[in-house]
From Swiss-Prot:
Gene field: pyrB
Protein name per the record: Aspartate carbamoyltransferase catalytic subunit
Record: residues binding carbamoyl phosphate: R66, T67, R116, H149, Q152, G284, P285
Record-level GO BP terms: 'de novo' pyrimidine nucleobase biosynthetic process; 'de novo' UMP biosynthetic process; amino acid metabolic process
Family: Belongs to the aspartate/ornithine carbamoyltransferase superfamily. ATCase family.
Quaternary structure and interacting proteins, as annotated: Heterododecamer (2C3:3R2) of six catalytic PyrB chains organized as two trimers (C3), and six regulatory PyrI chains organized as three dimers (R2).
Primary role: Catalyzes the condensation of carbamoyl phosphate and aspartate to form carbamoyl aspartate and inorganic phosphate, the committed step in the de novo pyrimidine nucleotide biosynthesis pathway.
Length: 329
């Protein structure tokens, strides 16, 4: 496995900001590399010296449990040094700009910065600023507003492909598979990134949700839209439910959580419409009894949520490794 990691990689991307222009070959490379690191994480000693001496900064301006912790564990498993930034206790509270904060870490020798922000486009702006300074630092988008969440979509892709072939996860395994994404599509950066990856890999993507949370613009991504759940679920191989982002929506978009669950909540009865062997995904955090019932979430025969979390560490290890040059420091 370690010999495979030392092989030359056709990776030319400096940043991971969006999946809109990711190629099938790049998805294949990420999956292959993540598969190798998944083997590392299954060992008793879950650490390799690959990025020893490198500095990874987690620049999170928005609350996060899974994503920040996953990036931290990924960097530490690669033996990198990790700095976790807290906006609440930083000089931002004194009027410092995000760019000045980033430049401060640049002066301290960071190699990769992971940026999460409530506003769309911030990671891209940070990347442009670093490029204008002539810095070789790479930027990873860990979620920006309603725009994208590339690493979540990559770990979802890895979860699906390893389920279909644990020994050789590859994008073409999703060809012809019906994948349904249900919920607050309008505000979901996860949905946008997953649309990019799943369609590129040959998946048949269907979106379902209330008309107020599922605008027609999503057809341009190659998805089929449904405002009624039953037709969307018919013959589905995978169903991904999304959290209702009440903090981003006005009261006029949704009558009530109870009404939403009645019309769009995933229950065992509704799963009968899907293909035999259907599996469930959720990027988290989950509102139990709203997006899907608790018994489904806790059923290991149906739920892939724990596998998604596990996949996240391996996928983020792969991205850090590839951005660092695909070789040990």
């Amino acid at each position: 496995m370690l010999a495979a990691l030392n092989a030359p990689f056709p990776w030319t991307r400096r940043h991971v900001l969006s999946l809109e222009d990711f190629s099938a070959a790049e998805y294949a490379l990420v999956l292959q590399t993540a598969g190798s690191f998944q083997q590392v994480l299954a060992r008793r000693n879950r650490k390799v010296p690959t990025l020893q001496g490198r500095i990874i900064v987690n620049l999170f301006f928005e609350s996060s449990t899974r994503t920040r912790t996953s990036f931290e564990l990924a960097a530490k498993a690669l033996s990198a040094d990790v700095v976790n930034f807290s906006a609440a206790t930083s000089s931002l509270t004194k009027g410092e700009t995000i760019f000045d904060t980033t430049r401060t870490f640049l002066a301290m020798g960071m190699d990769i910065v992971v940026v999460r922000h409530r506003d769309s486009g911030v990671p891209h702006a940070v990347a442009r600023d670093l490029e204008q300074l002539g810095s070789p630092v790479s930027v990873i988008n860990a979620g920006d507003g309603q725009h994208e969440h590339p690493t979540q979509a990559l770990l979802d892709l890895f979860t699906l492909c390893t389920l279909l072939d644990a020994y050789d996860p590859r994008p073409e395994l999703l060809a012809g598979k019906k994948i349904v994404i249900v919920g607050d599509i309008l505000h979901s950066r996860v949905a946008r990134s997953n649309l990019c990856s799943l369609v590129t890999c040959g998946g048949e993507v269907h979106l379902a949700g209330p008309p107020t949370l599922l605008p027609g613009e999503f057809r341009q991504y190659g998805a089929t839209l449904h405002h009624h759940l039953a037709p969307a679920l018919e013959g589905a191989d995978f169903v991904m439910t999304l959290r209702l982002q009440k903090e981003r929506m006005g009261d006029y978009l949704l009558p009530s959580l109870r009404e939403y669950h009645r019309l769009y909540g995933i229950t065992r009865e509704r799963l009968a419409l899907c293909s035999p062997g259907v599996r469930l995904l959720h990027p988290g955090p989950v509102n139990r009894g709203v997006e899907l019932s608790s018994d489904l979430l806790d059923d290991p025969r149906l739920s892939l949520v724990s596998q998604q979390v596990t996949s996240g560490v391996a996928v983020r290890m792969a991205l850090l490794y590839l951005l660092a040059g695909g070789k040990a420091a």
